[in-house]
Each structure stands twice: as structure tokens, then as C-alpha cells.
Amino acid sequence: MKTEIQEIVTRLDQQSNKGEGGESMKWLFRPLLQMLAGGESVTIEDMATTTGKPVEEVKKVLQSLPSVEIDEQGRVVGLGLTLIPTPHHFTVDGKQLYAWCALDTLIFPALIGRSVNIESPCHSTGEPIRLNVEPDHIVSVEPSTAVVSIVTPDDMSSIRTAFCNEVHFFSSPNAAEDWLDQHPGGKVLSVEDAFELGRLMGTRYEESRPANGSCCDI
């Protein structure tokens, strides 16, 4: 299974580098998630300050992202982690946030460095699936038989359309059978294996550092 997970990571990384945001996501994504985890929309100026990038560069990257969610004031309200309700409830430090897909809920605790409670319906039966996830491990999963669907699309120019919209929780492998029949190239992973997949995928994103480069920037 470790080999299979690594193959999925390699495939998704290759497509992500050519897809939405490309290499820019490596410096933008993690700091943006950490700011969104505070439960408030994020300004371009705040992103520039946090990443140490010029405002115009941040603005240009955001304008190139077809999936990013921006409010009427031009502030970011969602990119993977979102303030806009989805089926994937993501509660961090008492704040109710949401994620675009099942795998996001498993990737983001490590990227934001927080313990998270997750609730999401089985895509087939509607049965609630509840998890408590720490940055480095899964504390609990109910039901224990839950699995996560995974796809590896060729075109990631819109990550939400191509990937996120097909990545769901199912209450059991049996509950995912119809989805697998409809997605011949798809797979289902145990929650533990999906967490490991997410951990490996998350390593492509840089740690945020102060804009003045004073910490560990030698």
C-alpha cells in the first residue's frame, strides 16, 4: 500500500505543478490556510505581508486561480479551506470552517498546526462520518470502516472541478462500490492511508516565515 500511495502522490504532484497555481502554490497555500483558519477573510495585503511577496505578485497569482473564492471586498474566503459552507465541516479552535473535499480535511491539520474535528456525510448513504485529527495522527474515526475516494485527473487546471469534487468520504468500502463503478480510474483508501497520502502531499508546501526573513533565513 505504501508504494501505491507514493505512486498517487507522484501523479498528483506532477499534475499539480502543471495545474492551478503551479509552483506559486508552494509559497502561497500554507500561509493562506493558516490565516483562513482564524475564521476571517484574508486581504491581499495580509497575504503579501505574511509571505514576504509584493502585493502585485500575490494579486497576480490569485487572479490565475479559477477555484479561489473571493468576496465582494476582494478578500479571500476560500482556497481548499473555506468560510463558505460545504458538506465537509471542519472545526478548529471552536470556529466552524469548511473544506472542499474529504482529503482536504486530512491534509489541513498538519498545514495549520491545529487539532481539528471533522464531520462529513457518506457520499452514498448520508451517514455522518466524524473524525478527530491532530497534525500528526488521527485520533478517532466513526465509523471505523470509513474510506476516502481518490482520483488522479490528467487536467488539474481547475483543482476543485477536476479533483476535489470527486474526493468523498464513504462509510465503508461497500458504500463506495457504485462510485467505483462510475469512476473506473478511481480508488478508495482507508482513512489512515488517506491521511498518509495527505501528509506526503502536504510536504510540497513551504513553511511560512516572517516577511523580514529574520527567523531561520540564513
UniProtKB/Swiss-Prot annotation:
It is an enzyme of class 4 (lyase). The keyword Methyltransferase does not apply. The keyword Ubl conjugation does not apply. Gene3D superfamilies: 3.30.450.410. It holds the Pfam family MerB. GO terms for biological process: response to mercury ion. This is Alkylmercury lyase.
